[in-house]
Amino acid sequence: MKILYPGTFDPLTNGHIDLIERAEKIFGNLVVAVLENTSKTPTFNLQRRIIQIKNSLSHLPNIEVISYSGLTVDCANELKANLILRGLRAMSDFEYELQIAHTNKSLNNDIETIFLSTNTNYSFLSSSLVKEVAKFGGEINHMVPPSVERDLKEYFK
């Protein structure tokens, strides 16, 4: 069974890492799929985000990191992944993620979406929030891994 954890990861946060570590314990392996979203202008380009993720997950040998563009369900089909993992911080996340899960299911009836609730330590955390704090010089060392912290400080210098 292949499990796909898709996202933009711009940037990767400690919340993402916690979810990946927990999923790896449950499922044994995971494919982290980094979206190249052409409708957004990311802070970090695709290659940089992949490097950040690989560096931050080097302690997890059963995690594969790939990139993709287009529909997540198409990426899952290409990988022959039948499960998509999503994290939920709040009820508002659930409403949005449920719509996406139903859409994916309508495009491929064999795809299932599994939701893991976020660790309460990271329930406030989002990539957008991290960038906002970093932009104004706030401390982000408890929000992101060290390599991402360095990259953000350099970016907003």
Swiss-Prot record:
The record marks H16 as: Transition state stabilizer. Substrate binds at T8, K40, T72, R86. It is found in: Cytoplasm. InterPro entries: Cyt_trans-like, PPAT, Rossmann-like_a/b/a_fold. GO terms for cellular component: cytoplasm. Its cofactor is Mg(2+). It is an enzyme of class 2 (transferase). Pathway: Cofactor biosynthesis; coenzyme A biosynthesis; CoA from (R)-pantothenate: step 4/5. Homohexamer. Belongs to the bacterial CoaD family. This is Phosphopantetheine adenylyltransferase. The gene is coaD.
